[in-house]
Curated annotation (Swiss-Prot):
It comes from Clostridium tetani (strain Massachusetts / E88). Residues 801-816 have a biased composition (Basic and acidic residues). The gene is secA. The lineage of its organism: Bacteria, Bacillati, Bacillota, Clostridia, Eubacteriales. It catalyses: ATP + H2O + cellular proteinSide 1 = ADP + phosphate + cellular proteinSide 2. ATP binds at residues 85, 103-107, 492. This is Protein translocase subunit SecA. The keyword Signal does not apply. It is an enzyme of class 7 (translocase). Pfam families: P-loop_SecA, SEC-C, SecA_DEAD, SecA_PP_bind, SecA_SW.
Amino acid sequence: MRIWEKIFGTYSQRELKRVIPIVDKIDKLDQTMQKLTDEELKNKTNEFKERLSKGETLDDILVEAFAVAREAAWRVVKLKPYREQLIGGIILHQGRIAEMKTGEGKTLVATLPAYLNALKGEGVHIVTVNDYLAKRDKETMGAIYEFLGLTVGVILHDLEHNERQEAYNCDITYGTNSELGFDYLRDNMVVYKEERVQRKLNFSIVDEVDSILIDEARTPLIISGQGEKSTEFYKVADYFAKSLIKEEDFTVDEKASAVMLTDKGIEKAEAYFKLENYADPENMEIQHHVVQALKANYSMKKDTDYMVRDGEVLIVDEFTGRVMDGRRYSDGLHQAIEAKEGVNVERESKTLATITYQNFFRMYDKLSGMTGTAQTEEVEFREIYGLDVVVIPTHKPVLRIDNSDVVYKSEKGKYMAIVDEIVETHKKGQPVLVGTVSIEKSELISEMLKRKGVPHQVLNAKYHEKEAEIVSHAGEYGMVTIATNMAGRGTDIKLEEEVIKAGGLKIIGTERHESRRIDNQLRGRSGRQGDPGASRFYVSLEDDLMRIFGSDKLKGIVEKLGLGDDEAIESKMVSNAIENAQKKVEGNNFDIRKTLIQYDDVINKQREIIYKQRSEVLEGADLKDQIQEMIRDVINSVVDSHISDIEEEFKEELDKLIKFLEDIFLPKDYIKVEHLENLSNDEIKEKLYDIAKNIYTDKEEEFESEQMRDIERVILLRVVDTKWMDHIDNMDHLKQGIGLRAYKQQDPVQAYQFEGSQMFDEMIYNIKVDTVRYLFRVQIEKAPEREQVAKETSTNQGGDDTLKKQPIKKEPKIGRNDLCPCGSGKKYKNCCGREV
């Protein structure tokens, strides 16, 4: 502990001193609240809403509101938030992260700030990591809010559109991070505002906040459509990758999770794909397929990174061990893995809309979170999200004994020792939870235990349907549970009396994770609410963490000691070496996430501009003036780009200008070079704008004014969506190659910002051009089938009534004040228009 922390206390301790007086005030109201009838307690909600409408703030009513919610919780679910939970609730209301250990009742804590903030009527989202927890929390805690007169909804994966709208319109809405994010993206793809489901993003309480905002931070949410590229090349690239020899043709950088061809490998690629120079930019597509095939075959591990079930490649979450349904690796990696595994290769998709969790959750007016482990990532929460972490004291002291790590030379020796430890613990009846890092490792231990005759249950991605049930049994007398990482997080492991006598739940970690936080989560499964327990991690020098990031000094000591497979060492120096390796990885991952957000901020600002303008269009703003402005901008831009100051080329330039404008809005041969050759650039612009305005006025006469406004809106939205999708792809391609700018002594992030901005300006211009083009071409179309039916009907009936109802297709009309198309230079009404 630093010297000033010894004198002044930690940051959390100092913050708690400010909160405790508020908790004391809530405590003092306890007796008053108990005396209220149910009706009087319920009426408090309307009283608070009225006070807020008269100018009081949420902080003004916090003490009373918390006291009301506390009493309601006791009456409805027979749970009364204790002081530590009140502290947690206040920290959440303040828009911070409350670190609360496992079993401290985070679900109940969330009800306090949720009730208070819902009183404003702007909505509160309580975010969990899966549908099961969202549904469970809504069912258990929803009754408290409903008792107090508030509405509660839950967003689940299979909800219909109107059910989603209903759930979001509730005062408090439970849902998963992915569903909330996807609904936001879908809302920004609709054509009618009535199709939107979400309201403004007001206040969010994120459960397991570290899992969502840090572990998932690099995972973009993507809504995609079917791509057009063939998948055959993935199979060709896979065949090539499988023919290569490690170290000779390619090298694997495990720290960077990268696989690279050697010079010899490049020669083989040139021979295999019949290329002159593999590095040529024209061979970029081949390079991309080869890189992904190499990564799929030599970096991605089956039953660790992914699993194959029913002929489908499924991603396994490295942090939770859960299958991530509906997710696919991007950039063709998923297709490369499908080719590797010999299953059906699906087409690469086209991204229609995308956002990262980092940027989605930063859009909330107020954001807060709860987790059992946040302190190790305190700097990241503060720097990226502006959230500080406050550690909430436990209700009862933690009695769990955390033993120091045991280090073995080989994996074989480590696993033998783990199994021996499980057997001995099982004999005493003490339950054991064994944490593994992959499906493969969990099945290895399971097999070893079977040979020893030890009954056990396995929880990994293959058995995820039974997750809650398996976890609920993990604390039973004599139970042995093998689980990948943090599967079962969010479900408490409760202990019976005889288990407490046997020493509580024992945690065995089979290797250290890259992040200390994940290790702490595993430990935190034991010792909840003052229960006894123990934890220990078993490590070998062959573990990925030690092999890739461990210090040579530690390896040297183990070699000098001449340890056998079944011999272990325990020392402070060993524990420090392991922690330093973890800090190294955490720092590396933090830097990656920081860089990612610098890149993502560029497209995020662009996304905000597009979605804001899109929203204004949806809200039914009259677009006529905006469309006229677009027409003027397009004409000005086209004239400026076509007409130079070179006299000799003027006529040729005018000819090209007219042809270009004929592709956008001018009817063919409507205007000739001689009509413009004696005018200045500004006069040309004005003349063309007047012509466009007249043509557009005639176009409006084909439709009713209201119908035309609707057409403008739909066309503009469709053009914006199409151009935005293409822009996302282009920005992605730019990002993939931007790292090479470092070789030119350019900052890749600055280069990405500059070029991304140019591409965005170009997209905005193209939106204007296409919108104008489509609006000038829009016609009342008649379908051929209908036309035939109409003819037959009119012949049979002999009347003209049906003819009036037929769709009418009109040709572009010449306005009376337009230039006559004969080329005379006179107005139409004074020339050929007279004859008409």
